[in-house]
Curated annotation (Swiss-Prot):
EC number: 3.6.4.-
Protein known as: Actin, muscle
Modified residues (N-acetylaspartate): D3
Function: Actins are highly conserved proteins that are involved in various types of cell motility and are ubiquitously expressed in all eukaryotic cells.
Organism: Manduca sexta (Tobacco hawkmoth)
Pfam families, sorted: Actin
GO cellular component: cytoplasm; cytoskeleton
Subcellular location: Cytoplasm, Cytoskeleton
Keywords: Acetylation, ATP-binding, Cytoplasm, Cytoskeleton, Hydrolase, Muscle protein, Nucleotide-binding, Oxidation
Catalytic activity: ATP + H2O = ADP + phosphate + H(+)
Methionine sulfoxide carried by residues: M45, M48
Family in the record: Belongs to the actin family.
Propeptide stretch(es), residue numbers: 1-2
Length: 376
C-alpha cells in the first residue's frame, strides 16, 4: 500500500483548514484554508483570466476583493457545491492525483447528522468515482496518532470541539460530548473585543487578519483574575501587531481574554460548560472502573489546543474537579495541530484496515446508507 501509485489519500476536512496527503506519510502534503471566495466587484479587464470562484490559498491571497465563505460550519458541511470545489481543488491542484485511482479516507466530527456522511459518500463515489472510501471519526484518529488505545481525546478545531473517551480501542458513544465552541467563535470574539479598543474589523477579509492575530499573540492564562490584574497594573503583557497596510496596533489583556472563553463560554453568551468541564463530564459518563485510565491519558488535538499555557491550565482545572488522589496527565503533543491527519495516515496504511474500505461495488449495491454499517 505504501507504493505511491496506489497509496490511499487521507483528507481531513476541517472547518478551518483542509489537510490532505498520502497514507504512510508522516505529515500532510497540502494544508490550505477551507474557504471559497467569490469576487465582490465587477471584472473590467479583459484577458485577466478572472475566475468566478477561488479556493484555499488563492482565495486567501486575493481576499481583499473577495467575499470568503467557509462551506463547513461547526464540523458540518453546509454548502455542498462549495465543498465539491474544495475536494476538486484538493485532488487536482494540491495533490495532483486522479481520485478514481486511489481509495480516500475522509474524517468527520462525532455526532454529526447521518445525512452528512451519506452525502460525503455519495459525492466521493458518484462525482469523483473513488474506487473505495471510508469515513473516520476525527478524535479517534488523534488517539491513533498518539500511539494509545485508551484515553480521552479533546479535539478542538475551528468549528467544533468534542471529547471522545476510548477504551482499548472502543469509542464509548454514550459518553461522547460535543461543544459547538471552537476557533472560529474565538476569532469572532477577538473581533468584538478589539472593537472596544477602537480597532474595527468587520469584513470577511478582516476576520482573517484577526485570526492571524489570535494565532500569533493569544495565550491561556493559568489564573485569569491574576492575569487581568497584572495587565491592568503594567504594560508588560502588551504586544504589537502590524496590519497589512503598515498600521501597528497594540493588544493587551485581549491576548488571554480571547481563549479564556474556552473555559468560560459565558464570555460568548453561551450557556455551555467550558472545555475542562466537558472533559470531566465525559469521563463521568464512563464506567467507574475505567475513569482512572482516562484521567491519566487526556490527549489534546486540533488547532484550538495550540495556545501556549493551555495544557497547564487544563491540568489545573481538571485537578480541581477530579478526586484528589487521582493521577491526571494531559498529553499535548507538539504536532497536535495535524494529529487527526497523522492518525488517518496510520490507519489507512495498516494491513488490517484494508478489508474495512467501502468499495465502489458495495456502494453500487447498497447505496449511501452503507457508510453507517461499515464506518464506526
Amino acid at each position: 500500500m505504501c507504493d505511491d501509485d496506489v497509496a490511499a489519500l487521507v483528507v481531513d476536512n476541517g472547518s478551518g483548514m483542509c489537510k490532505a496527503g498520502f497514507a504512510g506519510d508522516d505529515a500532510p502534503r497540502a494544508v490550505f484554508p477551507s474557504i471559497v471566495g467569490r469576487p465582490r466587484h465587477q471584472g473590467v479587464m479583459v484577458g485577466m483570466g478572472q475566475k468566478d470562484s477561488y479556493v484555499g490559498d488563492e482565495a486567501q491571497s486575493k481576499r481583499g476583493i473577495l467575499t470568503l465563505k467557509y462551506p463547513i460550519e461547526h464540523g458540518i458541511i453546509t454548502n455542498w457545491d462549495d465543498m465539491e470545489k474544495i475536494w476538486h481543488h484538493t485532488f487536482y491542484n494540491e495533490l495532483r492525483v486522479a481520485p478514481e485511482e486511489h481509495p480516500v479516507l475522509l474524517t468527520e466530527a462525532p455526532l454529526n447528522p447521518k445525512a452528512n456522511r451519506e452525502k460525503m459518500t455519495q459525492i466521493m463515489f458518484e462525482t469523483f468515482n473513488s474506487p473505495a472510501m471510508y469515513v473516520a471519526i476525527q478524535a479517534v484518529l488523534s488517539l491513533y496518532a498518539s500511539g494509545r488505545t485508551t484515553g480521552i481525546v479533546l479535539d478542538s478545531g475551528d468549528g467544533v470541539s468534542h471529547t471522545v473517551p476510548i477504551y482499548e480501542g472502543y469509542a464509548l458513544p454514550h459518553a461522547i460530548l460535543r461543544l459547538d465552541l471552537a476557533g472560529r467563535d474565538l476569532t469572532d470574539y477577538l473581533m468584538k473585543i478589539l472593537t472596544e479598543r477602537g480597532y474595527s474589523f468587520t469584513t470577511t477579509a478582516e476576520r482573517e487578519i484577526v485570526r492571524d492575530i489570535k494565532e500569533k499573540l493569544c495565550y491561556v492564562a493559568l489564573d485569569f483574575e491574576q492575569e487581568m490584574a497584572t495587565a491592568a497594573a503594567s504594560t508588560s503583557l502588551e504586544k504589537s501587531y502590524e496590519l497589512p497596510d503598515g498600521q501597528v496596533i497594540t493588544i493587551g489583556n485581549e491576548r488571554f481574554r480571547c481563549p479564556e472563553a474556552l473555559f468560560q463560554p459565558s464570555f460568548l453568551g453561551m450557556e455551555s460548560c467550558g472545555i475542562h468541564e466537558t472533559v470531566y463530564n465525559s469521563i463521568m459518563k464512563c464506567d467507574v472502573d475505567i475513569r482512572k485510565d482516562l484521567y491519566a491519558n487526556t490527549v489534546m488535538s486540533g488547532g484550538t489546543t495550540m495556545y501556549p499555557g493551555i495544557a497547564d491550565r487544563m491540568q489545573k482545572e481538571i485537578t480541581a474537579l477530579a478526586p484528589s488522589t487521582i493521577k491526571i496527565k494531559i498529553i499535548a503533543p507538539p504536532e497536535r495541530k495535524y494529529s487527526v491527519w497523522i492518525g488517518g495516515s496510520i490507519l489507512a496504511s495498516l494491513s488490517t484496515f484494508q478489508q474495512m474500505w467501502i468499495s465502489k461495488e458495495e456502494y453500487d449495491e447498497s447505496g449511501p446508507g452503507i457508510v453507517h454499517r461499515k464506518c464506526f
